[in-house]
Structure formats: structure tokens, C-alpha cells
A protein has these predicted regions:
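Alpha-helical, heptad-rich or low-complexity scaffold/stalk segments
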Residues: 21-104
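Bacterial N-terminal signal peptides
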Residues: 6-15
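Positively charged n-region of N-terminal signal peptides that target proteins for export
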Residues: 1-4
Length: 104
């Protein structure tokens, strides 16, 4: 009986974090799409926090690149510069040289 309970606890311990990450990734995608719409409408003050939250939930390089572009458009050049540097570093590490080049 103890082994069964221990096995169930162990199984739940591996399943629950994966479920939480999937939910975070889905929420991040929704936020990213909304931010993209706002960015396209030049509503940078509304778009940038959504890009930031999307990146926090699912830290993908593309989300960080979008956030950097948003901060640049918003006039927050120091923030954008740091983010572009991070994008370039991460993109090169991921083998995405075209993205790294666009970030520089």
C-alpha cells in the first residue's frame, strides 16, 4: 500500500508541473497575440506590459524580441537595448543566427 501511495505521489509530482507549464504557455500565447494587435495599432503603452507578461509566463526568445521592439517604439531605449542584447545572445545559443542578426 505504501508503495502505491508513494508511486501516485511521485506520478502527480511529475504531471502537475507539466500541466502548469502548458497552461502558462497557452496564456502566454493569448497575451502575445493581444499585444501584437495593440502594437500594430501603435498602442505601445498597452502592448508592452502584455509582451512582458507573455515572456514571464513562457520565456521564449521571440517574445523577448517583441518586447524589445515594443520598448524601442515606446521610447524606452535603454530597456530595449538590454533586451536586444539578450535576444542576440540567446538566439546565437539556439542557432537562430537570423534572429540574432535582427536583434543587433
Amino acid at each position: 500500500m505504501r508503495r502505491l501511495v508513494a508511486g501516485l505521489v511521485l506520478a502527480l509530482g511529475t504531471i502537475l508541473p507539466a500541466t502548469a507549464h502548458a497552461q502558462d504557455a497557452a496564456a502566454a500565447e493569448v497575451l502575445f497575440q493581444k499585444a501584437r494587435q495593440l502594437f500594430d495599432q501603435k498602442k505601445y503603452a498597452e502592448a508592452c506590459p502584455k509582451f512582458a507578461e507573455s515572456y514571464r509566463l513562457d520565456p521564449l526568445t521571440g517574445a523577448l524580441l517583441a518586447l524589445a521592439s515594443c520598448h524601442e517604439a515606446e521610447g524606452k531605449l535603454a530597456s530595449a537595448w538590454v533586451e536586444y542584447l539578450d535576444v542576440a545572445t540567446r538566439a546565437r545559443r539556439e542557432g537562430k543566427n537570423d534572429r540574432a542578426d535582427s536583434a543587433q
